[in-house]
Design a protein with these regions (language model features):
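Surface-exposed, low-hydrophobicity beta-strand/loop segments enriched in small/polar/acidic residues
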Residues: 1-148
Length: 148
């Protein structure tokens, strides 16, 4: 018996659609995208992140390697020293809604909604010293989703 192999057909990835065009929406695509039929699009909701020490800190350490994580939300993250110690310290990390999302330790990379490393300075941190990480709004445009 002869075996026939059928090639890919247009829109074969569509299994079903809701009535009244509920499955379709017009979006603006980020420039430079090479979109493939059937691939998933994701909205760019968060842009870059920047970090800064808050004026009035006693400790003179810095915040470095700041970036927005995959689950970041736009807004200002608060990083507050809760356990000071000589040449180290523990900081509570709060998201823009005021929810503690983790604890950062001086000298160790923090990874989560936002990513950063706190460095020790010549003067140790005291309770209440703080940093902020501001995650900017994204473009709101869409690009091909890449989970990697």
């Amino acid at each position: 018996m002869t075996e026939l192999i059928e090639g890919q057909n247009k829109a074969e990835f569509i299994v079903t659609e809701a009535n009244g065009s509920l499955s379709r929406e017009s979006v603006t695509v980020l420039s430079g995208q090479n979109l493939q039929p059937g691939h998933i699009l994701g909205k760019v909701s968060v842009g870059t992140a920047t970090g800064a020490a808050v004026s009035g800190n006693t400790g003179n350490g810095t915040i470095t390697d700041v970036s927005a994580g995959d689950t970041a939300r736009a807004g200002i993250y608060q990083i507050v020293c809760i356990e000071p110690a000589t040449n180290i310290g523990t900081f509570a990390v709060e998201n823009p809604n005021g929810v503690i999302i983790g604890h950062a330790v001086v000298g160790a990379a923090f990874a989560g909604e936002v990513n950063f490393t706190l460095t020790d300075g010549a003067t140790d941190f005291v309770a209440g010293d703080r940093f902020t990480v501001t995650a900017a709004e994204g473009s709101g445009k869409y690009k091909e989703y890449n989970p990697a």
